[in-house]
Structures are given as structure tokens and as C-alpha cells.
């Protein structure tokens, strides 16, 4: 980094991390979040760490930290419930956010994060529920009205990336079985022998060879295990060229990497909000259907929350449904879950995805360089390797570390030193410096702590 040269320090000098933090235009956003302290981490050994110092939290790819304002916002809704009961649903009730339209407090804000038109987004359910709804929803595709997955005798396969998140795998298999197909109709694109990431040209080749028999392509925007960020616009165009519907699981992409779902012509997408969008454990999810499907779309499965807002409480069986994805809403969303998401999205409104991405690229590059220096340390055979793509444009903030030594011993040693990250079996540790609240000093502390942990686990 050029700043290291300007300061006359090497990459491993803590002064570089401090200087990078001082120059960070988004540094103030950290104060918006509750950062657990060492004394709060049950696994931390307080003989090894300072009890009152912040823990090293690098697990926003699993669960984002709590925005401080979320407690206030949630308590406001509890107060509305306590003082108004059912009247909290209506504009003349005691609350400032009528529950009858509570999802509208977050829909537009979330649409900006994913690069969609407001009417293309619905906040509802959980990710896998939304995936099922989207796969059976009707849409006008290739000049015929079909669901995003309704197989025919000629076109019935589903193309996914190998080692997709298990819930996606289960959902897709169950869709196949529901339509009378078995696992042979599931095409999984795998990395080449000896590689960890999928070559997009291999996926494109499968599309070219088998596209006429593929009904739906479903990929994870950012792969949960390796951290690979797919070129969604390129893959979507190739899928459409072969007459396939293209959908995306954005669980590890939303709030992490820049997205332009509308401009990229994505057919459908779904995401959770408890990772980079910091809505809390089990938080409400999001769904997207491109506006091009709106004119000829009709919800395949329906519920009362998909009815036009001005008709919703008329309880009329002849009610008209909202167009597009909002017509897929089945039941009223949990108010507390919805406003928990609002707390985080208000912080996103203090910046933009371009600024967050710029910081993220620097944070993860700094982590990568420090980790690579640790790999190359004299006196040690390489104890791990980074399996996330080295191209910054093909990854988000996460680096996935494949351990060549005992990962359990290393992880336990990290926990004792107040590091919060996660392990995905059999031997990968995921490290995610989140630009909203992580610092360059967090990254520096992690790598120096990892060195200590590796040495401690090796000697134990």
C-alpha cells in the first residue's frame, strides 16, 4: 500500500492500520453499532485479553452486529402495542409507523441496496420460503406464461453451482421431486480438479451444451463457502440467450457487493437480511421479481397481504392483487422483525454502496496481504491457504481460509483470544471484515492474534 511507503513503515506495522483508520471516511459508522466486548464473549479467556476492550468481530457474513438504534425502534413498536393494541395497525393509531403498511418503511430502502425499482421488491417471510414462492410464481418469459420453474417434457433441468448453501440445495431438489423428477435433473457446476472456485466459462459451456433442456438457472450471488462473487449480468444474459429463467440467492451478496438487479435483467432473486443488513437473528427476508414480468404476472400462490393496500381490510373475496412480487405477499410481516431491519437500513442511508465497496476492497486487500505474509513466514510450512478468488472484483469482503493444520485447535485458540469468526466443515474458516463497522485495526489485531493462536495450538 502506498500509505505504508509514505509513513516509512512495513505492511505488518500497527501504525499502518491506525493511519488507514484515521483516513477512513466511513469510520464514524462504527459508533452506530453495539460492539461486543471481550468480557461479553463466553469463550474468551480474560487472562489473555483485556476485559473492557472490543472483541475482534469478523463474522458479519453469518450474523451482523446490532445497530444501536434498533433497540429504540423496536421499543417504539412495543410501546405502540402496549398503549394501542390493535389500533397500532392504522394511521390514526398511537404509533408513527402504521402496521398495515409496515413493510413500506423498508421496501424502498432495500430496493436501493439491491439496485431495483421499489415495486420490484417485497420484504417478507424467510429466504427459503421466498425461493419456493418465486420458483412457482407465474411470469411472462420467452413469450409464454410460465412459472420461474415449471418444467416441460423438453425443458425441466435446474442448473446450480456445486456446494450451494444446503437450504438452496434442499429447496431445488424438492421442487424437482414435486414435479416428478429426480436428482438427475439437477446440474451442478463444479470447480475443476485441484481448484476451489467455479470457472464461469465452465458454467457458460454447460448452458451452451444443455441450455435447451434447462428451465431455471439459480446461483448464489456470492458463494457462502468460498466467497466467490459471480458475474451475474454475464451469466444472466447467457441463460436468457438459451431461453432459461435466471434467479439468484443474494444471502451473501446483499449489502456486501454492488448489485443492479434491474439493469442486469435478473428474473428473480431472494435474500436474508441478518448478515450484512444486520436485522438480527432469523430476520425477515427479501424478494425481487423484475418489472418486465409485471404486466403479465399473476401470483401463483396467494394470501391476503398481496391484496392492494386500500382493499386489504375490506375482507372482500373479489379483492384485486398488487402487481409483481408484492402480489406474492401471503401474510402480514412481523412488525418487530421489519423495524429491526429498518434500524440498519437507516444507517445504509448515511452512505452508499459505492463508498462501502471502496472501503471493503481496501479492508479485504489489507487482510489478504497480512494473511499472505503469515503464510510465507520463515520457519513454518504453509499452515493455510486462501481459497477466495484473488481478483478483488470477483469477491466480497469475505476471505475463506483452508487450513492445513488442526482447524479446531486454531479456532479454539482464537476464541480464547476474543476473535469471533466461523468454521465451515471440514477445514475452512471464514473471515469477513464488514466496512460498516470493522476497522483496519480489527484486521491487524486478527492476523496477529491468528499468529499467536497457530503457535499456541501447535505447541499444545
UniProtKB/Swiss-Prot annotation:
Source organism phylogeny: Eukaryota, Choanoflagellata, Craspedida, Salpingoecidae, Monosiga
Gene3D superfamilies: Aspartate Aminotransferase, domain 1 (3.90.1150.10), Type I PLP-dependent aspartate aminotransferase-like (Major domain) (3.40.640.10)
The enzyme's E.C. designation: 3.7.1.3
Annotated source species: Monosiga brevicollis (Choanoflagellate)
Major enzyme class: hydrolase
Cofactor(s) needed: pyridoxal 5'-phosphate
Family the entry assigns: Belongs to the kynureninase family.
Protein name, UniProt field: Kynureninase
PANTHER family to which the protein is assigned, alphabetical: KYNURENINASE (PTHR14084:SF0)
Reaction equation(s) it catalyzes: L-kynurenine + H2O = anthranilate + L-alanine + H(+); 3-hydroxy-L-kynurenine + H2O = 3-hydroxyanthranilate + L-alanine + H(+)
One of the GO BP terms on file: 'de novo' NAD biosynthetic process from L-tryptophan
Chain segments annotated as coiled-coil in the UniProt record: none
Protein biosynthesis is among the record's keywords: no
InterPro entries: Kynureninase, PyrdxlP-dep_Trfase, PyrdxlP-dep_Trfase_major, PyrdxlP-dep_Trfase_small
Amino acid at each position: 500500500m502506498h500509505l505504508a511507503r509514505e509513513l516509512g513503515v512495513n505492511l505488518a506495522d500497527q501504525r499502518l492500520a491506525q493511519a488507514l483508520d484515521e483516513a477512513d471516511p466511513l469510520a464514524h459508522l462504527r459508533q452506530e453499532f453495539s460492539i461486543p466486548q471481550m468480557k461479553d464473549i463466553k469463550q474468551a479467556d480474560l487472562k489473555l485479553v483485556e476485559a473492557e476492550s472490543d472483541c475482534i468481530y469478523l463474522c458479519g457474513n453469518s450474523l451482523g452486529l446490532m445497530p444501536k438504534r434498533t433497540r429504540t425502534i423496536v421499543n417504539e413498536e412495543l410501546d405502540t402495542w402496549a398503549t394501542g393494541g390493535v389500533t397500532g395497525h392504522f394511521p390514526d393509531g398511537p404509533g408513527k409507523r402504521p402496521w398495515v403498511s409496515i413493510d413500506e418503511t423498508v421496501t424502498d430502502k432495500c430496493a436501493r441496496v439491491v439496485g431495483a425499482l421499489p415495486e420490484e421488491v417485497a420484504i417478507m417471510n424467510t429466504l427459503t420460503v421466498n425461493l419456493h414462492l418465486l420458483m412457482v410464481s407465474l411470469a411472462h418469459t420467452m413469450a409464454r406464461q410460465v412459472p420461474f420453474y415449471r418444467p416441460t417434457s423438453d425443458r425441466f433441468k435446474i442448473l446450480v453451482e456445486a456446494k450451494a448453501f444446503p437450504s438452496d440445495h434442499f429447496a431445488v431438489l424438492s421442487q424437482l421431486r414435486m414435479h416428478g423428477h429426480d436428482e438427475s435433473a439437477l446440474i451442478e457446476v463444479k470447480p475443476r480438479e485441484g481448484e476451489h472456485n467455479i470457472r464461469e466459462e465452465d458454467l457458460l459451456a454447460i448452458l451452451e451444451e444443455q441450455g435447451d433442456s434447462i428451465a431455471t438457472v439459480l446461483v448464489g450471488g456470492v458463494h457462502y463457502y468460498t466467497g466467490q462473487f459471480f458475474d451475474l449480468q454475464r451469466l444472466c444474459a447467457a441463460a436468457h440467450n438459451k431461453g432459461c429463467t435466471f434467479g439468484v440467492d443474494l444471502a451473501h451478496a446483499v449489502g456486501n457487493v454492488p448489485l443492479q438487479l434491474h439493469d442486469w435483467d435478473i428474473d428473480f432473486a431472494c435474500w436474508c437480511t441478518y448478515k450484512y443488513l444486520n436485522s438480527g437473528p432469523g430476520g425477515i427476508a427479501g424478494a425481487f421479481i423484475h418489472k418486465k414480468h409485471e404486466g403479465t404476472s399473476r401470483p401463483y400462490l396467494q394470501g391476503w397481504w398481496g391484496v392492494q393496500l386500500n382493499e386489504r381490510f375490506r375482507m372482500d373475496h373479489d379483492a384485486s392483487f398488487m402487481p409483481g412480487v408484492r402480489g406474492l405477499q401471503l401474510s402480514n410481516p412481523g412488525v418487530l422483525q421489519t423495524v429491526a431491519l429498518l434500524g440498519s437500513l437507516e444507517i445504509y442511508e448515511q452512505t452508499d454502496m459505492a463508498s462501502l465497496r471502496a472501503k471493503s476492497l481496501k479492508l479485504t486487500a489489507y487482510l489478504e496481504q497480512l494473511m499472505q505474509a503469515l503464510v510465507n513466514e520463515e520457519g513454518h510450512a504453509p499452515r493455510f491457504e486462501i481459497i477466495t478468488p484473488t481478483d478483488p472484483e470477483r469477491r466480497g469482503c469475505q476471505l475463506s481460509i483452508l487450513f492445513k493444520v488442526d482447524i479446531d485447535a486454531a479456532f479454539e485458540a482464537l476464541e480464547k483470544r476474543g476473535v469471533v469468526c466461523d468454521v465451515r466443515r471440514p477445514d475452512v474458516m471464514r473471515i469477513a471484515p464488514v466496512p460498516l463497522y470493522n476497522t483496519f485495526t480489527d484486521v491487524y489485531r486478527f492476523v496477529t492474534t491468528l499468529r499467536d493462536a497457530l503457535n499456541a495450538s501447535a505447541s499444545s
